[in-house]
C-alpha cells in the first residue's frame, strides 16, 4: 500500500481516522508535484460506500492533511473500490473476504470465478460450485472483484 517514508507517515495519519469512521483503508496514494500534493484514499465497508461517505471522510481528512508537514497545497480524492476493482495487494483478500472474485491463474485459459474465502498459509481459499479450492498466491496472475 505504501512505499516511501512520506507515504508511511501519511498512513499513520489517515488509517486511524478511516477506521474511526467505520471504514477499512484499501489503498493510499501520494503524488507530489511542484504545485503541491495529491492524496488518493480508497475506502471499503461491507454495507457499501456512498458519495456522502466519501464526502464526510474528505471533510474530516482535509484539515489534518493541510497541517501535515511537507505536503504543501493538498488535493484529496476519496473513493470506493468500485465494483470490479483489481486486487493489488494480498491484504485486500482479507478486506474483501466473502465477496465474489475472478482469478486469472498462471497457465489458465480463462477467468475462474468464485467467492473469496481469504488467505491462509499463503494460499487463497475460493468457494466455487459447492467446492472449496485453494490457490497459492504465486499462482494468481490477476484478481479482481466480481460484480456479477
PLM features: what roles do these ranges have?
Residues 1-113, 117-148:
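Short Lys/Arg-rich amphipathic alpha-helical segments
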Amino acid at each position: 500500500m505504501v512505499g516511501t517514508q512520506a507515504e508511511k507517515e501519511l498512513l499513520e495519519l489517515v488509517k486511524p481516522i478511516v477506521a474511526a469512521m467505520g471504514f477499512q483503508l484499501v489503498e493510499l496514494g501520494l503524488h507530489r508535484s511542484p504545485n503541491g500534493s495529491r492524496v488518493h484514499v480508497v475506502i471499503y465497508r461491507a454495507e457499501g460506500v456512498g458519495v456522502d461517505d466519501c464526502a464526510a471522510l474528505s471533510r474530516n481528512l482535509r484539515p489534518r492533511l493541510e497541517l501535515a508537514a511537507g505536503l504543501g497545497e493538498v488535493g484529496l480524492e476519496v473513493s470506493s473500490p468500485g465494483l470490479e476493482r483489481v486486487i493489488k495487494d494480498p491484504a485486500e483478500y482479507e478486506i474483501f473476504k466473502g465477496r465474489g472474485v475472478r482469478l486469472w491463474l498462471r497457465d489458465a485459459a480463462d477467468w475462474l470465478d468464485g467467492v473469496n474465502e481469504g488467505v491462509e498459509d499463503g494460499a487463497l481459499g475460493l468457494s466455487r460450485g459447492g467446492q472449496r479450492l485453494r490457490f497459492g498466491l504465486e499462482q494468481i496472475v490477476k484478481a479482481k472483484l466480481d460484480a456479477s
